[in-house]
């Protein structure tokens, strides 16, 4: 099993798909990496030799921000927005949608579960 950037790549998948298991690498970036290293995209992960794994690892370390570094960068960006109190930062702080979606109804994913509010009680009939 190939281990790249702290992620165990699935053995029986094509290397093109297996690389997408690394956070920060999608299908297009995976194809780009394989083109740079001259590795066929149809090779299964278990059939890679050590030299090919090392070449993929070197390209990832030198050219791309992946896994922990990328997650740290994203969280620092959000923290910066919150500190300088931009509109997006305030929406992050309040846990509301950032990009202009309506919040009077919907927005349940961002705001969390439904909170029931007690309504008026009907007066008993006489």
UniProtKB/Swiss-Prot annotation:
What main location does UniProt list? plastid
Any GO molecular function: rRNA binding
What's in the GO CC field?
chloroplast; cytosol; small ribosomal subunit
Annotated InterPro entries: Rbsml_uS13_C, Ribosomal_uS13, Ribosomal_uS13-like_H2TH, Ribosomal_uS13_bac-type, Ribosomal_uS13_CS
Subcellular location(s): the record lists: Plastid, Chloroplast
GO terms of biological process kind: translation
Would you identify the family this protein belongs to, as annotated? Answer: Belongs to the universal ribosomal protein uS13 family.
What is this protein identified as?
Answer: Small ribosomal subunit protein uS13c
Gene that codes for this?
rps13
């Amino acid at each position: 099993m190939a281990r790249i950037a702290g992620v165990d790549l699935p053995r029986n998948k094509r290397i093109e798909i297996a690389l997408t298991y690394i956070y920060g690498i999608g299908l297009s970036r995976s194809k780009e990496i394989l083109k740079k290293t001259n590795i066929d995209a149809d090779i299964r992960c278990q059939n890679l030799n050590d030299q090919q794994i090392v070449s993929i690892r070197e390209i990832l370390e030198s050219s791309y921000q992946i896994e922990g570094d990328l997650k740290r960068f994203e969280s620092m960006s959000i923290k910066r927005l919150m500190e300088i109190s931009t509109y997006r930062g305030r929406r992050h702080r309040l846990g509301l949608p950032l990009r202009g979606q309506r919040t009077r109804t919907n927005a349940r994913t961002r705001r969390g579960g439904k909170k029931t509010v007690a309504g008026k009680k009907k007066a008993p009939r006489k």
